[in-house]
Structure formats: C-alpha cells, structure tokens
C-alpha cells in the first residue's frame, strides 16, 4: 500500500494493534481482517486505518458542538501526530506500554487512541465500545481512555490500569470523590474535535495530587473572551484560535478551572443532553 510519508515517518517500530505488529504488512493484514469482520467497531477501525495511511494530508472529522453547532471539519494528520506526542510526554507513556481502546473509532477519542499507539509504539487492544469496558478482558493495562460514564460503571476495575484519562462529559463531585480513592493515576481532560483531543489535563487521583485546575500541554495558551468563555491558542494541533462556550476561571496563560457551559449544553458518553 502507498503510505503517507509523514505518517510513515512517525510509525513507531514497536506499535501493535491486537498483537499485530504495525509495519506495512501488519497494517495491510489488520485492514483486511477488520474490513471482513462482522463487528462494526472493527469495520470502522479499518476505515480509519485506510484514511490514516492514505496520501491525503487531511482527515474529515465530526465535531461534538463544543465551539458551536456540530459540523464536519478537516484536520491535519500532522496535528494529530503532535497531539499524540504531547499526551505521551505529559503522561510519560513508553513504547511497549499496553493500552486499551473501548471508544468508538469513528470519533476523535477513539481515533486518537489508534494514533497514539502508532506514534508512541503502544500495544493497543481493541474491544467493542461498552458501558462496562473492562468486562471483555481480564488483562491489566498501562493506559486507558474512558468516558466518565464508563469509569463510573467500572469503579471496581479501574485499578487494573496504571493511567486513565477521562473525557467527553463533566465529572460530578460525587463521582470525583469516589475516583480519588482508586490507586491509579486518573486525569480529567479538556479538549474537543477542533483541538484533535485534549489540550489540558488535571489530576483526579491519587487523592494527594487532586486538583480542580487544568494545565495546558505543549505550547497551548488560554484566555477569556468578553463573556468569560475560554479562548485557546494551540499551534501544535490547530491553525486558528478556538473560541469555546466554556465559562472558566483563569490561573495564568496555561491553567484554568472549568465552571460550566454558557449554553448549558453538556456531553454524556458522546451524546448531547
């Protein structure tokens, strides 16, 4: 297959998906196997892998509505690669770390788990998106991304992951208190499709590190508009300033507290309510 040069240059030699090495032959094998599967989540993964390794510079993504009405946008593969590298550096992920993906790979959160595996050299296990993500496997993992809803239904299993990032919906105070008791590094993320996943994180657990303040990653800077909403400049993952409907309290140019939505819209498991 003809691979995008940038993508090929950033394909880590230790990357694996479902135990298959992600060299050129392995990628072709994964695409063929997943395309022929009756499982919709594998078919969607095959579609993304085809798009990712194609010569096209951009990918089309659907936004969730954080910055306004949900719409289709195009993002640079280069920005997705940068995002993966920033997350890897912040969380100190290592090549060979085991990762679990139980998020839909037709949306940015699931797509970025695939990109992180390919770029950082993770060994990624794919399972169907589920409200009980650990039910399908008895294995332990170094890195997992979940929605708060998935985490809430898996409180007794979260110790099986060394590092967990949560995103896609607000985390209630009651849930946050429960999460603090788990012996795992757990982070709340802030981001959106326009920033190809998160641009800031805050620690939830362990309890000693808990904070309400998000810290930006990479070169991202933040400020407020006249309505008190967050504005983001994140040159590594987006070409333009991003104006959100999220009301925040600033703590300098690289930290903020999330106070709520100007339009009172929140996301829950990827569904707007």
Q: Where does each model-flagged region fall?
A:
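Conserved coil-to-alpha-helix start sites within the AMP-binding
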Residues: 2-23, 102-119
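Conserved pre-ATP/AMP-binding loop-to-beta segment of ANL
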Residues: 44-62, 95-96
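Conserved S/T- and glycine-rich ATP-binding loop of Class I adenylate-forming
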Residues: 63-66, 99, 114, 144, ...
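Gly/Ser/Thr-rich phosphate-binding loop
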Residues: 154-207
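Conserved ATP-binding/catalytic segment of the ANL
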Residues: 229-273
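Conserved ATP-binding loop and adjacent catalytic segment of the adenylate-forming AMP-binding
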Residues: 184-227, 237-241
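AMP-binding/adenylate-forming
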Residues: 77-82, 98-153
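Conserved AMP-binding A3 loop
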Residues: 58-85, 92
């Amino acid at each position: 297959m003809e691979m995008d040069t940038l993508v090929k240059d950033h394909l880590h030699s230790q990357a694996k998906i479902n135990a298959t090495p992600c060299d050129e032959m392995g990628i072709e094998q994964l695409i063929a196997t997943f395309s022929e599967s009756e499982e919709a989540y594998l078919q969607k993964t095959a579609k993304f892998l085809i798009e990712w390794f194609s010569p096209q510079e951009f990918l089309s993504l659907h936004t969730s509505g954080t910055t306004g009405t949900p719409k289709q946008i195009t993002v640079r593969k280069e920005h997705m690669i940068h995002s993966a590298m920033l997350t890897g550096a912040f969380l100190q992920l290592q090549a060979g770390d085991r990762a679990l993906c139980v998020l839909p790979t037709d949306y940015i959160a699931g797509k970025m788990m695939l990109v992180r595996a390919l770029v950082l050299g993770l060994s990624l296990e794919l399972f169907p998106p589920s409200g009980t993500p650990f039910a399908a496997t008895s294995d332990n993992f170094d890195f997992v991304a979940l929605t708060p809803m998935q985490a809430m239904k898996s409180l007794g299993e979260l110790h099986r992951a060394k590092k967990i990032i949560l995103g896609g919906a607000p985390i209630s105070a009651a849930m946050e208190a429960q999460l603090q008791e788990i012996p795992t590094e757990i982070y709340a993320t802030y981001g959106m499709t326009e920033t190809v996943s998160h641009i800031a994180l805050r620690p939830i657990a362990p309890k000693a590190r808990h904070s309400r303040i998000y810290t930006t990653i990479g070169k991202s800077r933040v400020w407020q508009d006249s309505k008190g909403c967050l504005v983001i400049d994140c040159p590594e993952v987006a070409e333009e300033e991003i104006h959100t409907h999220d009301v925040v309290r600033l703590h300098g140019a690289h930290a903020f507290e999330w106070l709520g939505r100007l339009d009172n819209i929140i996301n829950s498991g990827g569904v707007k309510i």
